[in-house]
């Protein structure tokens, strides 16, 4: 005759030998029926599908203890065991302290504005410097030109007007022409001596007398021509 447990649980196998693993456990006769029920419920077995299987609440604790035996937790214990032969190596980078004040981070917009402002100020300063340099160069050039002209004026000897004095003496009013020729010779002597001040004075006098002699001579020639014409006209009527 079948036992009461077999009648109540027809789906359970008759022997739990197929549930033995490679690691034998100490079996306790009172709790084996509960383990058998739990294994049968979890793993399933052959039997009629319409039969209802009842679970004893009191045997649940024993079933859980049987399920979580050292054989089931063997892999977990192996995983949790500390590794005696392993060691961790950490690499740390030593950063030397930077000398000077720390730089404040600036955004791209602010950096662009700073660069633009510096560029503008630099261009204005350079332009002002170029203008000042140009003005200084122009002033120095003007000063040097004036000094050169003064030097040239002082170094150039005055003219003696020899040809003009000769013409005034021979062809024009000869008394003034002779005086102009005299001052012309004095100019040449002053130039030869290096006295440019006296040479310039005598040169101006010679020029004035020669011009006056020419003017007086021209006036005399005109007067003589007019007198001659008047005389010829009177003789013709008489």
UniProtKB/Swiss-Prot annotation:
GO cellular component assignments: Golgi apparatus; intracellular membrane-bounded organelle; membrane
UniProt KW keywords: Golgi apparatus, Membrane, Transmembrane, Transmembrane helix
Subcellular location: Membrane; Golgi apparatus, cis-Golgi network
PANTHER family: SYNAPSE DIFFERENTIATION-INDUCING GENE PROTEIN 1-LIKE, UPF0338 PROTEIN
Species per Swiss-Prot/TrEMBL record: Homo sapiens (Human)
Name of this protein: Synapse differentiation-inducing gene protein 1-like
Highest classification ranks of the organism: Eukaryota, Metazoa, Chordata, Craniata, Vertebrata
Membrane topology: Multi-pass membrane protein
Predominant location: membrane
Similarity comment: family membership: Belongs to the CD225/Dispanin family.
Listed transmembrane segments: 163-183, 206-226
The keyword Transmembrane helix belongs to this UniProt entry's keyword annotation: yes
Sequence segments annotated as region (Disordered): 1-29, 83-111, 127-154
Pfam families in alphabetical order: CD225
Cytoplasmic side: 184-205
Compositional bias ranges of the Acidic residues kind: 129-151
InterPro entries: CD225/Dispanin_fam (IPR007593)
Extracellular topological domain residue ranges: 1-162, 227-238
């Amino acid at each position: 005759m079948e036992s009461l447990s077999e009648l109540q649980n027809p789906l359970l196998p008759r022997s739990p030998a197929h549930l033995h693993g490679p690691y034998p456990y100490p079996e306790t006769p009172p709790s084996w029926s509960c383990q058998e029920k739990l294994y049968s419920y979890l793993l399933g077995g052959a039997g009629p599908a319409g039969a209802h299987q009842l679970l004893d609440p009191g045997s649940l604790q024993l079933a859980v203890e049987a399920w979580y035996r050292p054989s089931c937790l063997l892999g977990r214990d192996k995983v949790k065991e500390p590794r005696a032969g392993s060691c961790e190596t950490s690499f740390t980078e030593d950063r030397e302290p930077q000398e000077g004040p720390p730089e404040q981070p600036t955004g791209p917009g602010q950096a662009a504005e700073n660069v633009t402002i510096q560029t503008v100020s630099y261009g204005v300063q350079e332009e002002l410097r170029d203008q000042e340099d140009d003005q200084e160069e122009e002033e120095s050039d003007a000063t040097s030109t004036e000094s050169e002209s003064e030097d040239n004026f002082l170094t150039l000897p005055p003219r003696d007007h020899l040809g003009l004095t000769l013409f005034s003496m021979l062809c024009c009013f000869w008394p003034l022409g002779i005086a102009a020729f005299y001052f012309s010779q004095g100019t040449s002597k002053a130039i030869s001596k290096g006295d440019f001040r006296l040479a310039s004075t005598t040169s101006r006098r010679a020029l004035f007398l020669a011009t006056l002699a020419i003017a007086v001579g021209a006036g005399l020639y005109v007067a003589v021509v007019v007198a001659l014409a008047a005389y010829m006209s009177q003789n013709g009527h008489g």
